[in-house]
Amino acid sequence: MARHPARCLLLLVAALSLQLTGCSDDSPQASGKRTNTPPTTGSAASGPAASEAARSAPFSLREYDGPIDPGPHRLPLISWERSYPVDALVHVPPGFITPGGWVIDNGRNGPAYGDLMVYGDVDLVDTDPCGAGRNVKPGSTVRDLAQSLVDQVPHWATTPEPITVGGHRGLYVELRVPSNLSRCESGEFTVFAVDQVENPWYSAGPGSVLRFWIVDVDGQRVAVAVKVVPGRTTHTAELVHMAETARFVENSGG
């Protein structure tokens, strides 16, 4: 009789063990679910995952190609193998895409093209964007670059105006591209070049308006460039607003 309680106790322990094992198999850890862990971030090829929108850190468009989720995003200074101490931080509204590093109006109509790009260096300026001009070095300061654009013939640029972007002072210059580029050697209006690489020129098609906000960010000259075609680019106001409200943050390297 004394052995029966022990046997009952063993049976009770075994039953409890089986019950606990069953509960463990249904747990998130056992099934591979991680309820308290955000989903894996999307790769550069696939773009930001849904979790990116919920994170406080803006997503970098450095390597991403595709539609841009509305919200704050980092734009690298266009470099072609150069590195810079800062990124531009812009708040992108709906309706834009990126090929990796800058913002493009997502219009389906080719002539409606518009974009926003951020440059860290301008190595050469074409003295005659539509003819056989010389390529000159613009110097290293904000005023040097602005004046080089103004000096282009036949004087396409407006007089530089003082501006502030992201708390940094600079100059604003606007260029209006002729509607007829038939006399242009390349058929395009070539403004300036970045580095000595294949297709380094920043250029525009007929009738474009080019806007430049050139600022000094703690010793780094930055040119925020917006290209639109008046009456055709779908989101001109949004592109300009992104440029005017840009901020500059430390380069995160990604």
Please describe what each predicted stretch is.
Residues 31-32, 136-142, 191-194:
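Extracellular/mature segments of secreted proteins
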Residues 132-150:
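Short, basic/low-complexity N-terminal boundary segments at the transition from targeting/disordered tails
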Residues 144-213:
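Signature of long, low-cysteine stretches enriched in small and polar/charged residues
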Residues 2-133, 204-209, 215-254:
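N-terminal targeting sequences that direct proteins away from the cytosol to non-cytosolic compartments
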